[in-house]
């Protein structure tokens, strides 16, 4: 029988049908090759938006800089970055007037954070520009390299472990005449292999000392490395994102902490909360506008889009905002917070890897590094690239481009949200002094504007006033891409509002399925995703039950662990059948060992091992979870692990799941080919840290481990702990006198070695 699909929707409210419009099947696009072109686009565009500003030259590094602040007022609708200082300050003052004490209190809270934050805060984060090696590294390695170089250049405040003291070193490093760094390099030589008698290339990794003069060091400290943003859907062109070095990161962290504290107190801010909390907060603003637009008023909502938000923001504007926000605070605090915007107004964008050329006829490939773009003959390039290079040339120094205006993606999300909210705040009747008024929501560059007025002319006037006010602070609302509708239907940060936020379950579809970490984690993540979607995304019981069955099926196919009594033949079926036959309580077998599935929608919160524990054979239990079984991995597993799940749209989300260490929680070994590359030095450093941390954990089991508050080093802490433990063990008779004496002797030797060093 044919079913008319429209019948399916007869009983469904229109807004619930949004999941059927899901556009994102298949893999998102990834970028290949170099990001140099995209970065040049960003730099050139940013300068174009501010082209009527004043040019100056940075006296320290000789970089040309463009300052659009207080530039000409816009005469057309083209995007521009000419923010007016007095307008920004006025918006800040009004924000403070409507929220008495907001800046004062946020400053006090931030001051407390600044005093307490430890340097290891900077190890969070993924790729970071490592200025010592002039390329990207994991954050922890980049921080360690920076501290190592600082210490070898007599900058030692950081030894206290406080982030604030590390930043003192950063400030001091900028005044030094030169900095000595250690770089890794690669030597290649051809040698004859004894076994095969063939010639092979042998690579050795060396470390060499290099001196950077003040100018070179400053350029590196102010450099943002650029990469291409991957996995962006719905765009034809890729775009560049930036990753700053360790000198900038600490200062940015404190500014963002302050801005975060302010955002938490603003009802129009979509940051820093997320998920259901965010929906509730936003729904309040909408409710307020709808109840206030009594029968006499019209209410319209704009689903807003800003043109090139980051490229029209300006660090100098942020400096003005911070100066105002912290105006009654102690001098040291104001100085620390003003450093991030100052460094950003002197930033340099690293152009990345450069261009790859290949000659089809001669089968040759050659890399033109970014450093050569300043001098190379342009006849080799196509027209569009030629134009880009010509435009960027005056800005180049050592393969980096001077980029004073603009913010680069994702650096000051919180602070720019404060700026956006301050304009929304000006929509109150007491400021507009007319019949229209507005309010709205702001989350970084995304906004929704709700305008109320007695008639359509009033709505139009309100929108125009908002548009012009934004222009004065460097925010460019796009008239082409923004959409106005009666209040009650709009979209904000991928949340769709129709008389309440609609659960767009299809957005979560890509996160269903088998993650591919290991059998244990995958089972746990799979059921947690289903559970979370029942809680947050209107996933109904019948659909959830179906999702669960599909997941189990998918899981069995992925790990070839079909039930022991199945007819399906796979590589593992022989072993699993044998296990099935010799197991008395077959329900006790995990799904990954060919057991049946006991999950249903009521028990998704229980890890599978716990669910089946009472049903397991004793000897199976003993193999599965025995800490003495070499295949049971206990090192890496905490009781709660976190996985990264990818929704279809928006950032990857971190999701927590319960983890139980069993023979199935294996960790894949690292690819060995890294050992032959110049990354090897990095790997050795990483292993050294791992060993130190493991040793430290032996001395301080997690129950007694508190963050060190004093300024003792790890070694001192371990030595004093060893002495205390030894004394207790000796006095309680757990160790003999000779052993006690030997421990004390070792401790003294270690201290002696430290003194000599």
From Swiss-Prot:
It catalyses: RNA(n) + a ribonucleoside 5'-triphosphate = RNA(n+1) + diphosphate. It holds the Pfam family Flu_PB1. Phosphorylated by host PRKCA. Coiled coil: none annotated. One of its GO terms (biological process) is DNA-templated transcription. One of its GO terms (molecular function) is RNA-directed RNA polymerase activity. Its EC number is 2.7.7.48. Residues 286-483 form the RdRp catalytic domain. Gene3D superfamilies: 6.10.140.720. A motif (Nuclear localization signal) lies at residues 187-195, 203-216. Residues 55-82 are annotated as: Disordered. Keywords: Eukaryotic host gene expression shutoff by virus, Eukaryotic host transcription shutoff by virus, Host cytoplasm, Host gene expression shutoff by virus, Host nucleus, Host-virus interaction, Inhibition of host RNA polymerase II by virus, Nucleotide-binding, Nucleotidyltransferase, Phosphoprotein, RNA-directed RNA polymerase, Transferase, Viral RNA replication, Viral transcription. Signal peptide: none annotated. GO terms for cellular component: host cell cytoplasm; host cell nucleus. RNA-dependent RNA polymerase which is responsible for replication and transcription of virus RNA segments. The transcription of viral mRNAs occurs by a unique mechanism called cap-snatching. 5' methylated caps of cellular mRNAs are cleaved after 10-13 nucleotides by PA. In turn, these short capped RNAs are used as primers by PB1 for transcription of viral mRNAs. During virus replication, PB1 initiates RNA synthesis and copy vRNA into complementary RNA (cRNA) which in turn serves as a template for the production of more vRNAs. Influenza RNA polymerase is composed of three subunits: PB1, PB2 and PA. Interacts (via N-terminus) with PA (via C-terminus). Interacts (via C-terminus) with PB2 (via N-terminus); this interaction is essential for transcription initiation. Belongs to the influenza viruses polymerase PB1 family. This is RNA-directed RNA polymerase catalytic subunit. It comes from Influenza A virus (strain A/Equine/London/1416/1973 H7N7).
